[in-house]
Amino acid sequence: MKRIIFIILAVAAIMAGSVSCQKDNVISGDPIVPQGEVTREFLSQIRVGKDGGFQYWYQDSPALKELKAFVATVTDPNCKGYVPPQDRVATFDVDGTLLCETAPYYFNWMLFFHRYLHDSTFTPPEKDRQWASQAEAYVLANRKSDKNWGLKQQELQAIGFRGMTDVEFSAYVSNFINNESVVGLSNLKWGTALYWPMIEVVSYLVANDFVVFLCTGVDRDVCRVIAEGIYDIPKYHMIASDVNYVLENQPEWVEMISSEDYEYTPGEEVQRGDFMQLSTAINKIIKMRRELGQKPILSWGNSSGDYPMFHYTNIDNKYPHISFCLLCDDMKRELGNEDKAKNCKTDCEKNGWIPVSMRDEWWTIYGPQVERN
């Protein structure tokens, strides 16, 4: 009788293994929390290994289970859904997906306000300063901007930093994120306003040989500064909004078509120029096609601006594919938006995307020392 029971159990185990390629979950111990103020150095040490070990997610998180199952399938050569490492492309939005989004508004806007209104080293034209002042007052009062302001803001921001080298601009952004506090949340600078659970997700995918790109409306060089040292993502894996670059002595009339008419002087610096193109909504698809040459198999975003990326990931993809949508439903530990979260969840249900609840699935967002104020 014991022999029969053993055989039945063994057959059941074999059958279970043939159905699912998922490995056993690895459940970590007490989450690591720093003493005192959170630093970027601490964030850089948040890592998840190949087999899991997530600290900052609740272990019964439905989204985490979906993620682990998907990764287990596409990385197992014995599974039908196996994907070669070079094709395990994953794309992540930044604002609201990796970085605090509306505190009180998008990072690009807050950097723009700082440059035009609160930076004594820069004097913008008066009409531009007035526009920035009016926009700041509106944004601070409403946590949103007029839908027609986006292009103008990008153009003015590019002008505000025009002529800077990459070293100068990176230093400026680094100084901003390391010294400017997030509005509405205590004990939090912009440089540490990164979601701990999402740092884990990115590191988990990298450990499993995914090729990770950030796909965002944030300025490409800003994105590089924010990501540096936190995520194991190369600087050339940023699909983002762009400015033109010019040589320091290059006349304004020399553009791409006539660039052969300009003779480069060795040692000339490459400088930031005027605004070129946003990388939001459908432009994410266009830029992914141009820069990746293939579809991602995993995408992660948080709003309707990421829906084109989700559709691009999931329609006519030759490989297994999945998209996650982060819901801004935490009203206690984050500056959430319940209406937006509900709408996004409904859209997930309609389209087969995976909703991720900050409130219900994350043990922490920025660490327990950060509170709404």
PLM region descriptions:
Residues 1-4:
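Positively charged n-region of N-terminal signal peptides that target proteins for export
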Residues 24, 93-95, 306:
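Acidic side chains
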Residues 36-53, 171-373:
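C-terminal cap/substrate-recognition subdomain and adjoining C-terminal extension
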Residues 8-16:
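Bacterial N-terminal signal peptides
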Residues 33-254:
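Alpha-helical substrate-recognition element adjacent to the catalytic core
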Residues 17-37:
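Bacterial Sec-dependent N-terminal signal peptides
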